[in-house]
Amino acid sequence: MREAIDLVSADGGSANGGDHAPRNTAAAIAQLQAIMADDVGPFRTKDKLLRASKGILALSRELGKRPPGRAAAFDMQRLEWFDLRNMLAVANAVTWSALLRPESRGAHQREDCPDMLPQWRVHKQVKRIGGEFDFTTVPVAADAKVLAS
């Protein structure tokens, strides 16, 4: 929690946290949307997902580690920075969850893995711990009841 408070109140200095040149947030969001639509949509392959992961990483690096400018009320540039930062985190979690599930299930089809695999009848849980994602699997509720009895 302290880390989040420090980030919100941080003085980013230059237009992009002193890390990079200023970035048009709307253009970055459009680029992220294109990456997700093209490579992480309902029809996926390992290659597309890896390409998406690289694109998301590049956008994250371009965004920088600190928000632009100084903390001030109603600073839309800072707000957009935090919005994009959160969008990139969710995009990364979705992409890696898909990479870690090498099968087709429901509306999401792996063109390189067209079959449903019984061992993947699980839920994926994603937690963010210290800036890193932790992926775990838990049984589907119906299976959990059978296992408990």
Region annotations inferred by a language model:
Residues 1-149:
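Glycine- and aromatic-enriched mobile tails/lids
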